[in-house]
Swiss-Prot record:
It comes from Macaca fascicularis. The keyword Transcription regulation does not apply. Monomer. In its precursor form, weakly interacts with full-length MEFV; the mature cytokine does not interact at all. Interacts with integrins ITGAV:ITGBV and ITGA5:ITGB1; integrin-binding is required for IL1B signaling. Interacts with cargo receptor TMED10; the interaction is direct and is required for the secretion of IL1B mature form. Interacts with HSP90AB1; the interaction facilitates cargo translocation into the ERGIC. Interacts with HSP90B1; the interaction facilitates cargo translocation into the ERGIC. GO terms for biological process: cellular response to lipopolysaccharide; cytokine-mediated signaling pathway; fever generation; immune response; positive regulation of cell division; positive regulation of immature T cell proliferation in thymus; positive regulation of T-helper 1 cell cytokine production; positive regulation of type II interferon production. Pfam families: IL1 (PF00340), IL1_propep (PF02394). The keyword Secreted applies. The record marks K171, K179, K181, K190, K204 as: Important for interaction with integrin. This is Interleukin-1 beta.
Amino acid sequence: MAEVPELASEMMAYYSGNEDDLFFDVDGPKQMKCSFQDLDLCPLDGGIQLQISHEHYNEGFRQAVSVVVAMEKLRKMLVPCPQIFQDNDLSTLIPFIFEEEPVFLDTRNNDACVHDAPVRSLHCTLRDAQLKSLVMSGPYELKALHLQGQDLEQQVVFSMSFVQGEESNDKIPVALGLKAKNLYLSCVLKDDKPTLQLESVDPKNYPKKKMEKRFVFNKIEINNKLEFESAQFPNWYISTSQAESMPVFLGGTRGGQDITDFTMQFVS
């Protein structure tokens, strides 16, 4: 039986020598050519076309068989697909790599995450509907009075922090601390009555995203005026008196003799 020569013998004589353009010729000039660049071997069922030059009909059987062997070897060689791999191609592979499973979040134990959340704050001053400013009256009390000129420097600057609470379209939960002081407005029950007070806190722990409910007020905006409703005692509001230099307190009526409307001025 006749032995078919390997590619390294006769076929190398017809090899072009260019790695980027591999082809085999029957004889001399490129009469018959099979280039890697011309073959897209990505489809497994794709065939290879073999072009025969009839001018070389007198070539020997060994050379003809060598060409066929070379073509078969080229056909079996793994040639990269020229198509560029894109992001959408990766998305088709993900379902085969990862298995989708539902994730259940236990919201009962998320206090630590809420505590670590950053707190957004701003500095501001507040004046009631009669343009009375809020100033300190003793170490733990605020009062409302009219200020003018240089006396305006006496008014309290609040650090308003946006905290966790029952937020809605018209209510934004906030905490009201005094700037540069470890004091926060809080609502507690004294003598069976909701009462407003200034409470001292540890600056290492305050402000925080999840404040205790006694520190939380629902900021409500109505006709460019602000109201501050106690989250601990609904329908009770930060209030001032019609009279001058009276303490700021927690009142249970709106639109009556007590003033519950305020304007806010931002402070840099």
